[in-house]
């Protein structure tokens, strides 16, 4: 993959209605927020640019933010707005709630897309994952310019992307697992494994934990 050959668009403007209106991209799974995990996958894959279509958030270095017009107009409008900022010839279009998406998955999508207009993941049942794909930027721009509905499937399906089926290793969570419902979120947190609450000050800290933190961790049954 050539440096600078692809960028990332993260669609993060949903209302989280199935999660009781919670700020879904800001929910924590494992040691990080959902949106930070997706952004980290893009950075690790060598993305030249990461554009988030959604509210601005602190703590996401190297990320630019845009808002669809009008706000809340839906994913197609958000994609249209974000594409106006895209500068790379290829762009990954991703949901903001994919805690197990990794750089290796994005690299696989980018490689598969080389032979066509784009490539998307399919899950273990063969269902297309429209918000886990990589596309020719100009192809998307042309498609969205002439599209006046609000369905991503209706927009992207006719482009006939390459379907990429990745088989996770035993015990590895699937990269397409999203967090649309409370049940999805619980499953993702279970798969991510036990972690200490943020107030303990661990997170991604590089300094060794204090004795008090170690004791609390032992009481909670997790590693410090």
Per-region residue spans from a language model:
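General N-terminal targeting signals
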Residues: 82-83, 117, 137-138, 157, ...
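Conserved alpha/beta core of the MobA/IspD/sugar-nucleotide pyrophosphorylase nucleotidyltransferase superfamily
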Residues: 2, 150-224
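Short glycine- and hydrophobic/aromatic-rich loop-to-beta-strand nucleating segment
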Residues: 129-135, 177-178
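Nucleotide and nucleotide-moiety/phosphate-recognizing core
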Residues: 2-130, 142, 148-149, 160-168, ...
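Intrinsically disordered, low-complexity sequence elements enriched in Ser/Thr/Gly/Pro
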Residues: 16, 134, 202-206
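Short, positively charged, low-complexity/disordered linker segments
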Residues: 136-153, 208
């Amino acid at each position: 993959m050539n440096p600078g050959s692809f960028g990332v668009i993260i669609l993060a403007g949903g209302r989280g209605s199935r999660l009781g209106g919670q700020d879904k991209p800001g929910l924590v799974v494992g040691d990080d927020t959902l949106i930070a995990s997706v952004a980290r996958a893009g950075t690790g894959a060598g993305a030249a640019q990461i554009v988030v279509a959604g509210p601005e958030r602190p703590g996401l270095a190297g990320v630019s933010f845009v808002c669809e017009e009008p706000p809340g107009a839906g994913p197609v409008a958000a994609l249209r707005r974000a594409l106006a900022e895209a500068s790379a010839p290829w762009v990954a279009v991703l949901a903001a709630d994919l805690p197990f998406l990794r750089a290796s998955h994005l690299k696989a999508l980018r490689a598969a897309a080389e032979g066509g207009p784009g490539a998307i993941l399919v899950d273990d049942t063969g269902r297309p994952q429209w918000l886990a794909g990589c596309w020719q930027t100009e192809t998307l721009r042309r498609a969205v310019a002439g599209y006046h509905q609000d369905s991503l499937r209706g927009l992207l399906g006719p482009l006939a992307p390459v379907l990429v089926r990745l088989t996770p290793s035993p015990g590895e969570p699937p990269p397409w697992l999203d967090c649309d419902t409370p049940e999805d979120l619980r499953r993702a947190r279970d798969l991510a494994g036990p972690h200490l609450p943020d107030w303990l000050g661990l997170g991604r800290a590089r300094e060794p934990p204090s004795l008090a933190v170690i004791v609390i961790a032992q009481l909670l049954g997790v590693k410090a």
